[in-house]
């Protein structure tokens, strides 16, 4: 099914930017709410901080950029196209996205599922590039906050 050629709809850049903005603000609000409820760092963040101290900052930054793009291609392109129904697409890719980030608590689990759902919403409303850009911007924000 995935190897068949399909027509890719062109997405207006304004629409893409609009949904990246909506997604970013939504992720920010959700993350702030979860942080107020439970201010403990996640297993994923602890692993990233440990890795950050082992490699030069530029290599780590490239790793984050690469991870954002590869994750979005896997979840919001390959797996996304294996399922036809939108609600199942979003649910499946969000749960798998959360599992890949090793949530250690129920709240961390909810946060990563929410992140996956918003990335899925942006993927649906714009395109893969929209979700890749949002994921990348989000990772860069988290990385810069980890530096301070």
Identify the function of each model-found stretch.
Residues 3-67:
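Juxtamembrane helix-loop-helix connectors linking adjacent transmembrane helices
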Residues 57-148:
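Transmembrane helix-loop-helix hairpins at the membrane interface
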